[in-house]
């Protein structure tokens, strides 16, 4: 998908260019990057605490930026009308890939922190719980996939339909709604990911 490739490349280039020459007195690019990182760190700190926020910031921060920019790309003039230019998060395969990445990272953190004891917790309190706990582990990312996909796809479809009925008045109000929904959905996705990753990292396992 063209939009996804452009967004991914833009995030990578921004990260490289803004951190290439770090200085005591930051320039504009470094200053913007530091403000964004600080904002994301404070957001995560409010959910999972400072230590966990610092540990998981690279993954969760990148996830948040990708999702929110992808959501916002849906308000571009040709989005949804030209093949390859739809918002990436309106594609089930993309939202599924995001959920799979979170799923893998969650269990990586669990194994990193607890080793074989993390694997063993799927059999507690009794081994008969194994199928239920495995189903829960797979259902969690699936639910996030469907939630993000459904809302962004539905929002794009409704926006295009209403805009065609009232092209002079609808766009501004609908774009404002799209901006709000895009940000909220990125926050919800990352907040749920925070909960699952922190559970895997916690001492309960």
PLM features per residue range, with description:
Residues 1-205:
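Selective transmembrane helix interface/packing segments
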């Amino acid at each position: 998908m063209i939009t996804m490739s452009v967004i991914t490349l833009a995030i990578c280039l921004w990260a490289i260019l803004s951190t290439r020459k770090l200085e005591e007195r930051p320039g504009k690019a470094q200053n913007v990057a530091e403000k964004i990182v600080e904002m994301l760190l404070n957001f995560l700190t409010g959910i999972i605490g400072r230590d966990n926020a610092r540990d998981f910031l690279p993954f969760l921060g990148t996830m948040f930026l990708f999702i929110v920019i992808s959501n916002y790309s849906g308000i571009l003039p040709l989005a949804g009308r030209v093949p390859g230019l739809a918002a990436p998060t309106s594609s089930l395969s993309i939202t599924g890939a995001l959920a799979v990445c979170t799923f893998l990272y969650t269990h990586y953190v669990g194994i990193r922190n607890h080793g074989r004891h993390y694997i063993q917790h799927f059999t507690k309190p009794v081994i008969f719980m194994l199928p239920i706990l495995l189903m829960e582990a797979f259902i969690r990312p699936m639910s996030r996939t469907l939630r993000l996909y459904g809302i962004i796809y539905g929002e794009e479809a409704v926006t295009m339909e209403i805009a065609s009925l009232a092209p002079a008045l609808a766009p501004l109000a609908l774009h404002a709604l799209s901006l709000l929904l895009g940000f909220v959905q990125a926050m919800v996705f990352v907040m749920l990911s925070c909960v699952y990753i922190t559970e895997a990292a916690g001492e309960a396992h």
